[in-house]
């Protein structure tokens, strides 16, 4: 649980990033848990400023509340005819989640990752309403940050990519594609070049002599993740126009997809 993650890995990682950043950064996978170091590095900066670990937890607790505020703004954009007081009360339902309360008390990357993902949805809704292209950039930027903090949110990139591709086409979207490609390079360099593969097998925080062992094979990962993405996108893809567009995209870019899979 969240307490086990905090005691077994996160608390130690934050302190170690503050004490010896370079060594901890280059050996982060030794901690044996599959959470991104980005948020832990951010929290370690507060230790550098003189705060103690409990004050860091206090900051994280209050940061978590912003999730409710951003969610409320999303509801306002989506349900413009509903009284704002009702929408605010609805947003407070997040407080009922034991997972949210636990992750808010014991600092973890999942809450800030979720905050930026909900912010992604907010910018996406703003784009749907205003059709202002600046919100496509805000959407992608916040999703990149969300994915860096909590990598599991990267699975939503295909949805936004195909949506914006349908709206603008490759030509108008080329700069955004380049931006996303460049944004992915640091994490790819960290995992594959520096060989700090925190996403691979590791120990379960909070439990001694217990581990989850499996080899990290890049080709297998592509197949597994691609299958998961396709499964979750399937309700969207079977809808008339979207399915036709997706089918045409696959046919037009068949050679490119084969080449990418082979690399």
What kind of region is each of these model predictions?
Residues 71-96, 114-115:
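Transmembrane-helix signature of polytopic, membrane-embedded enzymes
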Residues 90-92, 135-150, 158-161, 181-185:
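Membrane-interface alpha helices of multi-pass inner-membrane proteins
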Residues 102-112:
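Short acidic/glycine- and proline-prone juxtamembrane loop motifs at membrane-interface regions
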């Amino acid at each position: 649980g969240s307490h086990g993650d905090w005691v077994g890995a996160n608390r130690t990682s934050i302190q170690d990033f503050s004490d010896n950043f370079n060594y901890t950064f280059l050996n982060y996978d030794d901690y044996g848990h599959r959470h991104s170091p980005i948020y832990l590095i951010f929290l370690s900066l507060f230790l550098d400023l003189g705060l103690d670990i409990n004050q860091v937890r206090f900051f994280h607790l209050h940061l978590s509340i912003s999730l409710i505020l951003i969610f409320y703004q999303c509801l306002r954009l989506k349900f413009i005819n509903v009284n704002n007081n009702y929408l605010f009360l609805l947003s407070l339902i997040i407080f009922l989640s034991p997972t949210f309360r636990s992750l808010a008390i014991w600092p973890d990357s999942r809450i800030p990752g979720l905050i930026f993902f909900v912010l992604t949805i907010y910018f996406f809704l703003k784009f749907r309403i205003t059709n202002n292209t600046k919100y496509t950039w805000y959407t992608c930027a916040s999703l990149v940050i969300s994915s860096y903090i909590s990598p599991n949110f990267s699975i939503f990139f295909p949805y936004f990519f195909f949506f914006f591709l349908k709206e603008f086409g490759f030509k108008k979207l080329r700069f955004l594609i380049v931006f996303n490609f460049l944004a992915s390079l640091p994490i790819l360099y960290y995992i594959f070049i520096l060989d700090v593969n925190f996403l691979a097998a590791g120990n379960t925080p909070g439990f001694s002599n217990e581990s989850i062992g499996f080899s990290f094979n890049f080709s297998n990962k592509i197949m597994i993740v691609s299958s998961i993405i396709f499964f979750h996108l399937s309700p969207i893809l079977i809808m008339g126009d979207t399915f036709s567009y997706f089918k045409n995209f696959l046919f037009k870019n068949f050679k490119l997809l084969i080449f990418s899979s082979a690399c």
